[in-house]
Swiss-Prot record:
One of its GO terms (molecular function) is structural constituent of ribosome. This is Small ribosomal subunit protein bS21. One of its GO terms (cellular component) is ribosome. The keyword Ribosomal protein applies. GO terms for biological process: translation. Residues 44-65 are annotated as: Disordered. Belongs to the bacterial ribosomal protein bS21 family. Residues 48-57 have a biased composition (Basic residues).
Amino acid sequence: MVSVQLNDNESIDKMLKRFKKKYERAGVLKEFRKKAYFVKPSIDDRLKRSRGKRRAQRANEERNS
């Protein structure tokens, strides 16, 4: 669980900004979306492989640029 304390002389906007950063880094929303519905293991593996291929292609394009 992500928690943030309000520091002395800190505005609520800054505290919210810190909370949002911690929330994103913790991957709470990403995990929630991932578990929102069931994905068969075979489809999950297929998606992981396709993501890896795209990542490798982008890395290869960056090296060649």
